[in-house]
Design a protein with these regions (language model features):
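Conserved NAD(P)H cofactor-binding loop of Rossmann-fold oxidoreductase domains
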Residues: 91-96
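Conserved catalytic-site loops of classical short-chain dehydrogenases/reductases
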Residues: 85-86, 109
Length: 122
């Protein structure tokens, strides 16, 4: 495996409490980064903290489909850690498994807000 050094780098990983996001979080911690998980699932975030068990890992409960919440939390991360060096925009959802004709508009808006708008917001 290629080794890389992220000592004293600050990273935010959206959706960082599970799946690919957690794998990225773990690798960044191993490389020396300070990582802040942004996730909407507090239980999963707490489990990630317990699993990784590093003083360089913290989390914030952030709905990345909400521009105001993103800005508030960015300010908090910057005030605690300084400059943000790495931002991994990993949060996303698959939505429902149904036809377009049967797809509820509320669900469509939720998927678009999280998978598309949040990328622009972040």
């Amino acid at each position: 495996m290629i080794k890389f050094d992220l000592t004293n780098r600050v990273a935010i990983v959206t959706g960082g409490a599970q799946g690919f996001g957690l794998a990225i979080t773990e690798r960044f911690i191993e490389a020396g980064a300070k990582v802040v998980i942004w996730d909407i699932d507090e239980d999963a975030a707490k489990k990630a903290l317990d699993k990784v068990n590093s003083e360089n890992l913290s989390y914030q409960i952030v709905d990345v489909s909400n521009f105001e919440i993103i800005n508030k939390n960015l300010i908090e991360v910057e005030s605690k850690h300084g400059k943000i060096d790495i931002f991994i925009n990993n949060a996303g959802i698959a939505g429902m498994n149904t036809t377009v004709a049967e797809y509820p508009i509320e669900e469509w808006n939720k998927v678009i807000n999280l998978n598309l708008n949040s990328v622009f917001y972040c």
